Amino acid sequence: MFLSLIIPVYNVERYIDKTLKSILSQNAFPFTYEVIVVNDGTPDHSMEIVERYRYNFDNLTIINQENQGLSCARNSGLKIAKGDYVWFIDSDDSIPQDAFESLFPYLTRYRHEVLAFDITKIEEETGKKLTEKIFLKPKYYHLYNTSHNGTELNKKIHTGIVQRFIFCKSFLSRYHLTFTPGIIHEDIDFIVRILLHANSILPIAKPCYNYLLRSTGSIMSSLNIKSCTDRIKIIKLWNKIESEEHLSKMQTAVIEDNIFNICYGLLISSSGNVSSYEQFLRQNRNYIIRRGLTAALYSIFSYFSLGKVAKTSYLLINLLEK
């Protein structure tokens, strides 16, 4: 079996039909892929829709569990996945009609550890579509369709959406790569750890995923205090990796660069709940600034840019003002 698609389900009765239809109507033999739906204790009618599909498709499996959150649901699906590759799909998104046709040649002929591709962002209210390249800037487009080490792609590709990647399952198993339970920003944490270990990432110049921008917003659409505290947790998780694993200088640079980005982002963030945000800063400001400066000094030598120098100066000024 080439591919396992893992779909956590929670409160998506408006969307899950389109998601499953987009997958199960692909031009591919059923034995070449499986769909694993993880019912994360959804209280709505989503699973009634899923059950109708299971009746007609033998390659659809359902896992039922109490609500544990997105990371745990993905991990549950990963545990039973039979495919050589795994693709984490959100239950309000979809894939293009030719997605399998575009991706399967890479899954069957080559043994890349990770496939990365462009996505189409779709506004729910207007239906407006925008293609977002996997690369951050046009100057990196020449890197399409050639294999790269993960550390080479840091600062060159988008890392905030895990759905735009397909992973070799044996690669994930080898490095014990799973999602960290209970945190927001689990995708960033996961992808950074992917970049640390992957020796073969293939960027594909093709939009293979439809990412829905929901009009009701999402956890990520506004800053909240959990978002802030979870970013501190991620920094400490990465600190642990640095202390426990024998990382190369470039692997350490990947972590330090992303720690710097988190620290800088926390200081320039704004929040609807001003008092809670100010309390968070009072408790964590010195740690954020000092850790950010340490990360900046390390990563500047690896990824020098005037922008990073300017941001580092901002952190230093904040520290001196105390």
Give names to the regions the model predicted:
Residues 271-322:
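Membrane-interface aromatic/basic loop that binds lipid-linked glycans or pyrophosphate carriers
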Residues 12-26:
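Short, well-formed alpha-helical segments that are part of the catalytic scaffolds
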Residues 22, 39-48, 66:
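A conserved acidic beta->alpha catalytic loop
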Residues 206-215, 221-249, 262-287:
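Catalytic core of nucleotide-sugar-dependent glycosyltransferases
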Residues 65-81, 91, 102:
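Glycine-rich, basic loop-to-helix element that forms the pyrophosphate-binding segment
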Residues 70, 91-202, 211-223:
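Donor-binding/catalytic cores of nucleotide-activated saccharide
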Residues 2-4, 34, 189:
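Cell-envelope/extracellular polymer assembly enzymes that use nucleotide-activated donors
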Residues 86:
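Short aromatic/hydrophobic "clamp" motif used to bind/position activated sugar donors
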